[in-house]
């Protein structure tokens, strides 16, 4: 449920920013644009850490499989456990890929709104005009 709440919050934030940009509301838009670089950096760090953890877990799983194969015939229970671990890793990778895709779309939207704002809302223009 938590990822759905985060998606809804991000969508709401973009909607609010879009409305502020349409009104040339500098008081609402400028803080969002100013915080964007830090937000992007944090997202990249978080995505890197998660990808690094997935890779480490994949390597550990491969080492476990190799050790079991070298010890002799693989038991069905061991194979099932390996399959479950591999499926969990695949789910984590898909979730990370989805987050990266959504973040890319969000960044494109932010960049487009910022360009529109800079082009159509000259400094000193009254709010809503």
Model-assigned labels for residue ranges:
Residues 1-10:
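Sec-dependent N-terminal signal peptides
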Residues 6, 43-44, 50, 78, ...:
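Generic alpha-helical structural signal
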Residues 10-59:
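Immediate post-signal-peptide N-terminus of mature secreted/exported proteins
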Residues 18, 29-30, 40-42, 51-52, ...:
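Low-complexity, intrinsically disordered short peptide segments enriched in small/polar/basic residues
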Residues 21-32, 88-129:
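C-terminal amphipathic alpha-helix
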Residues 37, 47, 86, 120-121:
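Prokaryotic Sec-type signal peptides and long signal-anchor helices
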Residues 53-102:
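Mid-chain, structured segments of secreted extracytoplasmic proteins
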């Amino acid at each position: 449920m938590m990822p759905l709440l985060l998606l809804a919050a991000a969508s709401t934030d973009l909607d609010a920013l879009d409305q502020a940009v349409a009104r040339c509301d500098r008081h609402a838009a400028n803080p969002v644009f100013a915080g964007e670089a830090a937000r992007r950096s944090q997202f990249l760090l978080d995505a890197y850490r998660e990808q690094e953890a997935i890779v480490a877990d994949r390597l550990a799983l491969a080492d476990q499989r190799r050790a079991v194969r070298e010890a002799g015939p693989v038991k069905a229970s061991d194979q099932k456990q390996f399959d479950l671990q591999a499926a969990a890793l695949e789910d984590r990778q898909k979730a990370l890929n989805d987050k990266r895709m959504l973040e890319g779309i969000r960044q494109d939207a932010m960049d487009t709104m910022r360009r529109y704002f800079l082009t159509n809302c000259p400094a000193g223009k009254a709010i809503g005009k």
